[in-house]
């Protein structure tokens, strides 16, 4: 059974519901009981004269569960009222859309609470890490992976993350491992404290220092050198240095260090 509702508007939908005296609206969440399986969908009793229909592609937002294995006869649960099939005169239901709505609601709550999250890694691409949070695909840019080394061996493993940018309308979910690390170590990251770390990157604008699981930056302006050429001659990757914490940016997960302020 398929839908062919081109040009079918919300106003048409409301007229149909009124004609058949359904006390329902497009977008409603309704309770129903599964009573029959068909080839490409499920029949559901939601209290209307004609049974509602749940297409197989609307079973779950999780592609691994987008089949009938998660459903049983006589299961009673909630469904999202998605559409109306003119030919069959059936209301079309969705579990996938309901999961999507509830997932974003939960993500907004996690953002408001600035929660530390334990999230499954789904894979990697050139730009960073792909994750899954509450059934929604998200992304961790390379710049927010900290010292984490990308490798397929970590697929389906869990990593600590914090939300960085959430845009539901564009389905944009950006997270940060760097923020999570800063949050976990925040009690030890006190401005003015001296830390010891290993240089793991030398750039024209400063030194990146590995401090445990964290990565800190000693900007060129915070190094005791007279000219830029000295930075590559004076420092080598793997050198252990001491620096002072001058700023902890918990929002972006940045650790700023200085060698000028060493006593």
UniProtKB/Swiss-Prot annotation:
Keywords: Chloroplast, Plastid, Repeat, Ribonucleoprotein, Ribosomal protein. CDD domains: S1_RPS1_repeat_ec1_hs1 (cd05687), S1_RPS1_repeat_ec2_hs2 (cd04465). The gene is rps1. It is found in: Plastid, Chloroplast. Belongs to the bacterial ribosomal protein bS1 family. It comes from Pyropia yezoensis. Its main location: plastid. One of its GO terms (molecular function) is structural constituent of ribosome. The lineage of its organism: Eukaryota, Rhodophyta, Bangiophyceae, Bangiales, Bangiaceae. Residues 27-96, 114-178, 192-260 form the S1 motif domain. This is Small ribosomal subunit protein bS1c. One of its GO terms (biological process) is translation. InterPro entries: NA-bd_OB-fold, Ribos_protein_bS1-like, Ribosomal_protein_S1-like, S1_domain. One of its GO terms (cellular component) is chloroplast. It holds the Pfam family S1.
